[in-house]
Curated annotation (Swiss-Prot):
It comes from Arabidopsis thaliana (Mouse-ear cress). One of its GO terms (cellular component) is membrane. It is a multi-pass membrane protein. It holds the Pfam family SPX. The keyword rRNA processing does not apply. Coiled coil: none annotated. It comes from the Eukaryota. It is found in: Membrane. The chain crosses the membrane at residues 247-267, 278-298, 315-335, 337-356, 375-395, 411-431, 513-533, 544-564, 576-596, 604-624, 670-690. This is SPX domain-containing membrane protein At1g63010. Gene3D superfamilies: MFS general substrate transporter like domains. InterPro entries: MFS, MFS_Domain-Containing_Protein, MFS_trans_sf, SPX_dom, SPXM_SPX_plant. Residues 439-459 are annotated as: Disordered.
């Protein structure tokens, strides 16, 4: 908060200074309102109306100026079009160069306008959050309800922007035409290879994507990864040196993600048979599957902490732990030991390096391609989820070699052990440890000149100075600071413990984590008990279960394409969120076996509805979570990705425990006994969503 006032002054265009939101005034007003309410001199309702009116005026000033500038840019483009048509009739190479540069000048001015809108959008978000911190969502409920959803809302004009696409399209198309015309005057040896897209147009598109939180398929996938970044970071200010970025290392992290998801789901179709072959009940499959998740609850924390110092060593440890765990899982059959089986799965869970994979993308991949890397992380997870059961369906062979048995129960362990061994070799050969921040700093210090050091120290000193002067006379234009605000260092300081991270969770964040828990719980119930339920009601074989689970996994990417490319462009995220929750509720409700004999169509259709809706819900849920979560949770050990991972892993643990406990009621009652908690949690999440609906923006 404190840092943003100076950031706004530093980044704003001087000629446009009168059209930026008056962040300092609104911040002072918030403090003044708090004092008035505490003193009893002002009613909260009057405060809401007064501040809403002031914010409306600020937004109106910004929007009208934005539209005015767009009109000026459009007028310049219209005049350039006349010159363009004249050049097409009488080609002149010098005039083509001039016209291209004129179009680029318009593009640069449009880029400045987009940065203007972006600064105002960030300021609005921050002042809304500040008001929420002071008054507990009363203002957000009121303002968002009465402004954001209005058909003539100027608030949406700021966040969504209007008419920019037409200007960008005109600049891009005309530059492309001029490039083609220019090429006709040169031989192939004189004309250098032109880029696929003009750098100015590419910069504009990047600014548009950043401003609008573009909801295309790639970004929608990236939101699943919950790899957060600061609002104030731009590609030009990205601190990650692209020369130190290593593609093979990123590929190895994505490979780790893929193999771990395969490892998680490859045993699901055969876990009940394996349990019975060792003398346990079929429903013990819940413990077998869930033991990996139990270990992951703890491994996520130490892997996240370990990634503060190294990325290579945690990945090596992960590979070794998973290799040993899968060997133990495979050998449990010949040892006739359920304990060895469970210990093997626990060992696999201790090798869960998803926190490292997320952290590597967040900290070591340049901002320019971070969205693609995040989408790759989600795609690798989805592909692994589909490949696991499919691979289990292919391993329907049985033979014995020396003293070791190879069958449908043990082969998943043997195959994954070999896979992790090959991965470990590849890791040792190809992975390159990135430079840490301290190493980068030392390297930069050796290279920068004395004047650079002086200038850098001045900038850093200016950023560290408090905005409230504590001695002497305070200038009138100096920003005011109050006790509720964090210092610049604290506002970017990561949380150092789960308790500190929990204190940063607002009601909206807690509700989103509850929703994430609910959807992971429901999906785990559906997947983990599928082999037990289908064998009891329909006498399905392992191959049939594997095909069913693989088909469910294969729906992930198509559904994300549909939602990310189309549905999310037509509806708000919170509308999709609530609708998806209701559909999950209906899917759970239709899955119950109550009055009529249970049939395959009922099970498959209800399961498909529940799974697909949960996948849609996950993407939207994590998208909203990344927006409402504190920026202090974007980095460090106890980050937003770790919190969501822990919530999802805990849900899987509870779900698998529910399956095992439900088994004591008998296989005939297992279905309803496990669906009932899912139904209750789903209803609770819907109610919680309705209570915080107006704060989800």
């Amino acid at each position: 908060m404190v840092a943003f006032g100076k950031y706004l002054q530093r980044k704003q265009i001087e000629e446009w200074s009168g059209y930026y939101i008056n962040y300092k005034l609104m911040k002072k007003k918030v403090k003044q309102y708090a004092e008035q309410i505490q003193g009893g001199s002002q009613h909260p309702r009057h405060v809401l109306k007064d501040f809403s009116r002031m914010l409306d005026t600020q937004i109106e000033t910004t929007v009208l100026f934005m539209l005015e500038q767009q009109g000026l840019l459009s007028g310049r483009l219209a005049k350039l079009r006349e010159s363009h048509d004249a050049i097409l009739e009488q080609p002149d190479i010098s005039r083509i160069f001039e016209l291209r540069e004129a179009y680029r000048d318009v593009g640069r001015d449009l880029l400045q306008l987009l940065k203007f809108v972006e600064l105002n959008a960030i300021g609005l978000r921050k002042i809304l959050k500040k008001f929420d911190k002071r008054f507990g969502y009363r203002f957000a409920d009121y303002y968002v309800k009465t402004r954001a959803n209005h058909p003539y809302s100027q608030l949406q004009q700021v966040f969504k922007h209007v008419g920019v696409g037409a200007v960008v399209g005109a600049i891009s198309r005309n530059l492309h035409e001029l490039q083609e015309n220019e090429g006709s005057f040169y031989s192939i040896y004189d004309q250098p290879v032109l880029p696929a897209q003009d750098p100015v147009v590419e910069a504009i598109n990047n600014a548009v994507d950043k401003l609008t939180f573009s909801t295309n398929f790639l970004n929608f996938l990236a939101q699943h990864a919950l790899i957060m970044q600061d609002d104030l970071v731009t590609p030009s200010e990205d601190t990650i040196d692209e020369r130190s970025y290593h593609f093979n290392s990123l590929l190895l992290n994505l490979g780790n993600t893929f193999l771990y998801m395969v490892n998680t789901y490859i045993i699901v179709p055969t876990a009940d048979d394996y349990s019975m072959s060792l003398g346990a009940a079929a429903t013990v499959c819940g413990v077998v599957i869930g033991s990996m998740a139990v270990a992951q609850v703890f491994s996520s924390v130490y892997f996240s902490a370990w990634s503060n110092k190294s990325y290579f060593k945690p990945l090596v440890f992960s590979s070794i732990a998973l290799f040993i765990g899968n060997l133990m899982y495979a050998l449990a059959y010949d040892a006739n030991s359920i304990a060895l089986l469970l210990l093997g799965r626990v060992c696999c869970g201790l090798g869960s390096a998803r926190a490292v994979n997320r952290r590597y993308i967040s900290d070591c991949v340049p901002l320019r391609i971070r969205m693609q890397a995040s989408a790759g992380f989600v795609s690798a997870s989805a592909l692994g989820m589909a490949c696991g059961p499919a691979l289990a369906g292919l391993l329907q062979i049985k033979f014995k070699f020396y003293k070791f048995t190879f069958n449908q129960s043990t082969l998943p362990g043997w195959v994954m052990a070999v896979a992790w061994l090959f991965y470990l070799v590849w890791l040792c050969i190809s992975f390159r440890e990135p430079l840490r921040d301290t190493e980068d700093g030392e390297k930069n210090n050796r290279n920068e000149t004395t004047s650079d050091r002086v200038e850098s120290s001045r900038v850093e000193e200016g950023l560290r100075l408090p905005l409230l002067i504590t001695s002497g006379i305070k200038p009138e234009d100096e920003e005011e600071c109050d006790e509720s605000e964090e210092s610049p260092e604290d506002s970017h300081k990561p949380a150092n413990s789960f308790i500190e991270a929990y204190r940063l969770l607002t009601p909206s964040v807690k509700v989103q984590l509850l929703i994430y828990f609910m959807l992971k719980y429901s999906m785990e119930i559906l997947l983990s008990e599928s082999s037990v339920i289908t064998s009891y009601y329909f006498s399905w074989t392992t191959s049939s279960v594997a095909i069913f689970l693989a088909c469910l996994g294969l729906t992930v990417l198509p559904i994300n394409i549909l939602v990310g490319s189309y549905i999310s462009n037509m509806f708000e995220d919170r509308q999709i969120l609530l609708t998806s929750e209701i559909i999950v509720f209906l899917g759970i409700l239709f899955s119950f076996n109550l009055f009529v004999p249970y049939t395959v169509p009922q099970y498959v259709i209800s399961g498909l509805i529940m799974f697909v809706a949960a996948e849609v819900l996950e993407g939207v849920n994590l998208s909203l979570l990344s927006r409402v979560m504190s920026s202090r949770l974007s980095k460090g050990t106890y980050n937003g990705g770790l919190l969501s991972t822990e919530a999802g892993t805990l849900a899987r643990v509870v779900a698998d425990a529910t399956i095992t406990l439900g088994g004591y009621l008998g296989r005939g009652h297992l279905l309803n006994a496990t669906l009932l908690p899912s139904l209750v949690i789903c209803i609770g999440s819907i109610v919680a969503t309705c209570c915080t609906y107006n704060s989800l923006y």
